[in-house]
Amino acid sequence: MNDVYIIGGLRSYIGVYNGMYRHVPAEKLGAAVLQEVICAYGLVRIDEIIGGNSVGCGGNITRLAALEAGLDVSVPAVTVDMQCCSGLESIAIAAAKVASGQAECILAGGFDSASTQPRRSCHPNHPAYRGDENWYMTAQFCPQVWSEDCMLRCAEYTAEQFQITREMLDAWVLRSHALAGEAVREGVFQPCIAPVWGGARDEGIRPAMRPQLLRRLKPVLPDGTVITAANACLTNDGAAFVIVCSPAYARRYGLQPAVKIRGVVSCGTDPLLSPVGAVQAAEAVLTRCGLRGEDIDIFEINEAFALIGELFARQFPRCVAAYNPFGGALAYGHPYGATGAVLLLHAIEGLRARDGALGCCSIAGAGGLGKAMIIERV
């Protein structure tokens, strides 16, 4: 099997729901970043586009984004839905195609827009039909639960099962925003940001977040105790793509790889404990690669909920300093289908900033899923 390189890539600034991208459909946001990546790296031949998308309109929206971006009609495109894991799964699929010789260069990543997310309704034939005006935004992820707040309930249940307190969670919130604010001041991620559609900053970062503010917040669920609007990430708009290619392609076109992919893992867990998937996947990919947590210089773990940080610290107590050292999704946000590529780009830039060698990206997905990838700086 061939080695697989990531040359680099770009992400948009990440917008909050009804924020700076509120009138930008997901495919147009994705198209803009695709255009920027192609231009920035001078790509002349692309075999395929693979994009993750979780809450879009369906209908192979990645193909629509590719056509919006002006790619030649001969370049195929496919959309991946593994919910929050979609972007990282898209990159993993691209890597497998390159490793097996099916392709030499693929743009992979994803995009989503919470601001323009379609409302859906059950067909009258469906057992859950309750009338034409009974709209829903959240799909069903497990047989036991189907509600708009199911992920929040899973987070509450996970916190209860692992005896995680609100004070523990709020400490991770403060850490994430403080580190993200510092990263912005130092311009750590500026090289991987494409200021498309007028974006000028990541809208969710609050470096001045204070404990007093967090203590005033009420739980988001009427019967909840620990999950608040601060220790659960926001809903967001964003796009990110990376260049996945073979060593031969990189040599032929004079492209300098940033990292190579060392290993990839998918896993499943209890859907009602879905946040556990991020840590479980990280453990699994370390085992597959014959590594220990202490071997990793940067863990980019999607903190859809602050409790993921607490779960990580309990499983990897000696690696806390390497966990999201420039802040995580509690600050930057979580544009579902794009997040896997955002994690990878942050890991690449973070390794450069810290002169590190190995990075681990991991993410949990709705329905009890986990996806993780280990990269090595070239």
Features from the language model and the residues they span:
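Conserved catalytic cysteine-centered active-site region
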Residues: 53-104, 145-150, 211-234, 315-342, ...
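Active-site pocket-lining segment
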Residues: 154-156, 192, 199, 262-331
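Flexible glycine-/small-residue-enriched beta->alpha junction loops
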Residues: 105-157
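Conserved beta-ketoacyl condensing-enzyme motif
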Residues: 22-85, 89-98, 103-105, 111-125, ...
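Condensing-enzyme catalytic core mediating Claisen C-C bond formation in acyl metabolism
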Residues: 1-26, 212-276, 280-283, 288, ...
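Short, well-ordered amphipathic alpha-helical segments that serve as non-catalytic structural scaffolds
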Residues: 26-41, 61-65, 90, 151-158, ...
